Amino acid sequence: MTQLTVKALSEEIGTPVDRLMEQLADAGMNKASSDHVSDEEKQKLLSHLKKEHGDKSGESEPTRLTLQRKTRSTLSVAAGGGKSKDVQVEVRKKRTYVKRSTIEDDAKREAEEAAKREAEELAKREAEEQAKREAAEKAQREADEKAKREADAKREAEEKAKRAQADKAKKEMNAKNADANTQAKKEADELKRRQEEEAQRKAEQEAAKLVEEARKLAEENEARWSEEETKKKELENSDYHVTTSRYAREAEDAADRKEEGGARRKKKKPAKEEQSRGGRNQRGGKGRNKGKLAKPTSMQHGFDKSATVAKQDVVIGETIVLSELANKMSVKATEVIKVMMKMGAMATINQVIDQETAQLVAEEMGHKVVLRKENELEEAVLSDRDTNAEAVPRAPVVTIMGHVDHGKTSTLDYIRRTHVASGEAGGITQHIGAYHVETDNGMITFLDTPGHAAFTAMRARGAQATDIVVLVVAADDGVMPQTVEAIQHAKAAGVPLIVAVNKIDKEDANPDNVKNELAQYDVIPEEWGGENMFVHISAKQGTNIDGLLEAILLQSEVLELTAVAEGMASGVVVESRLDKGRGPVATVLVQSGTLNKGDIVLCGQEYGRVRAMRDELGKEITEAGPSIPVEILGLSGVPSSGDEATVVRDERKAREVANYRAGKFREVKLARQQKSKLENMFSNMTAGEVAELNVVLKADVQGSVEAIADSLLKLSTDEVKVSIVGSGVGGITETDAVLAEASNAIILGFNVRADASARRAIEAASVDLRYYSIIYQLIDEVKQAMGGMLAPEFKQEIIGLAEVRDVFKSPKLGAIAGCMVTEGLIKRNNPIRVLRDNVVIYEGELESLRRFKDDVQEVKNGYECGIGVKNYNDVRVGDQIEVFEIVEIKRTLD
């Protein structure tokens, strides 16, 4: 590290030069202002200054750290009148962190010092008492000795004075001495006993007091620590927002996340390096030697962030991606993979794991698991509906089904007294028509389905949404493929079947034959003991149409059809399309409740508020009850036909459910594609190059898109594959043209047209655009286009045969075969075969063909010629030369 002079160091730390030189001198280093100061001398000076200020340990570790933070942000909130205003948001935070280890050490050290002091005082008092006892015993002994000496002197004096009474005085004196000794001994023993008891009592009191003080100190510390822990948890869990505005709170949280994310990315520099730089980096100066980091010394603060992983609630759905699970647990995905490997399961970061496995992993890592059903939100939204009204009788929903051109729409046309059939392209129905009619005996709702083979999905939807199926069978045609399919749909849906035998006015009509054919498919007439009603009608002349209506109403009475007439409505999407002027339009058949203008409707992956409602005649209406078909406007997109339409309370929740359904549909679609890729991997590896016909399909309604797409995909073969790169409802736009150009596709429009910008883009890119109004023509032309993409088939056709009569040698060409043409025609430059005993021995081509000395292009049957075979000289007499040509055969799709 670069050494600084004394003057430069004083400028960095903000201390006068003279003052710094005095401090260096006190530390034992005499320096001038121009002298250099090394890192060791700086360390020595710092230690000296700390000792001067009373820090004996030579280090100063902060025990309390206070962090203050202030963030400013600008928030745009909505104001009155559709305007917005900017609000300055300032968030101030102050947090104090206490080093718990320091508090615990101080408390423990204080308790130990107090106990040590008490023990020292107790030992001191015991020593003083012992000294007092020894002094008393010594005084007693001295007193006893003095008394004894005095007694001896007195006795000697008395013996001298009174010789006569010596014996008597001696006896009395001995008795007195004995009594005095006994009494003194008793007093000394009593005094010693009292002193020992007093010392023991005081020692016990002091020990009890010391124990009580230690207990109180421990309780106070425990209470203080628990209170600090509680406050810390409350601070962490409390809502620290300084405003009640939702927008301000969101802005504050975003600012916090940004700051905390930036703080985590910054590297913490060692304290020694910071100290030696004198705070240059804090003031914005450029530091040197960024690549070399000094080792941390004791000057680094002792506050360390806890490395313990926070335990939290982990919400797990039915399936979850491993990386998402790791993100919810705030750990790296590699840690989750390690835990799974310990549990005996191998996984990758993008692998989808089930709910049970994810629960085991999360619990293994110490988190609390909250299991959530995937359709929990959907169930909550659909259950929050007012559907407790009383059920009342409703009109039957009748679906007209049958083979194409058997008179379904004509029958319905006669009932409605309109001319719907003439409006359909080619006289065939290509959409589901929903109508309700009033009869003398009540209302009936009719669904008219297409009979063409391509509209299988439409017929299936019609059968699912219906109460009664009317099967129209032409008396002259009998049972046809779509007739059988309609029977299967009706049986699968579990709805009763009424057979309408149409076209009985024709001469070749044979109703009995129809009954016999239908009996093979378990459709037995009532007169034969079955359950199906047969009605003979003529849609053209209107024969027995009333009888058909009576049969329908009779069947509906038997079914006892009821529905809730009031409350929030629910129904099914019969058809949908994209109208250029009105947006997404859906035909909905209301099945229960009342659909009102302004209701919030959830249709599959789409949602919206009903802006307008129209009946089948195009009239504006405000409400629709059960069994009434209506067109609704206002959805977010074009729903799929067959989706359930439900009125909900909250538009926000409806949007969430729709988005969830869209995400789920995408997951299922991707999973299906992945499965298809895995299943077809081997076949794709073994198969050769496959021609691909890319198609951009646009139609007027959703049902037609589905039907055409399904029919086109069924045309795919092993050699030519149809790929629908784009499809949708509505007119052809410039986006469709760009997509077709990028994918080298053709554009097929079914009952739709391209706008001006799309036409310009199509002409500029030379994209093939075709319009259709009848599905027959569309499918036939796509078949022809696919046939043109098939690899051609080549066939070898023999055009002539020549017999070798002689062989000549030519200096230029080698062996020349003199031949007689026995069959067909010999042409020059055609491929040939040389046959010997009817076995091919060489295959090549003609190099020279001459008649006499002239080169000719061909030689006919019965003429002689000379033939030179290219690169072959082993021609012998008797060989046959076979001339053939390769013919290309055009292939078509069967």
Swiss-Prot record:
Membrane spanning stretches: none
Keyword Glycoprotein carried by entry: no
Region (G3): 448-451
Residue positions binding GTP: 402-409, 448-452, 502-505
Region annotation G2: where it falls in the sequence: 427-431
Alphabetical UniProt keywords: Cytoplasm, GTP-binding, Initiation factor, Nucleotide-binding, Protein biosynthesis
Gene3D superfamilies, per database record: P-loop containing nucleotide triphosphate hydrolases, Putative DNA-binding domain, N-terminal subdomain of bacterial translation initiation factor IF2, Translation factors, Translation initiation factor IF- 2, domain 3
Localization, UniProt: Cytoplasm
UniProt feature, compositional bias: Basic and acidic residues: 33-44, 52-62, 101-174, 184-239, 247-263
UniProt function note: One of the essential components for the initiation of protein synthesis. Protects formylmethionyl-tRNA from spontaneous hydrolysis and promotes its binding to the 30S ribosomal subunits. Also involved in the hydrolysis of GTP during the formation of the 70S ribosomal complex.
Protein name according to UniProt: Translation initiation factor IF-2
Gene transcribed to yield this protein: infB
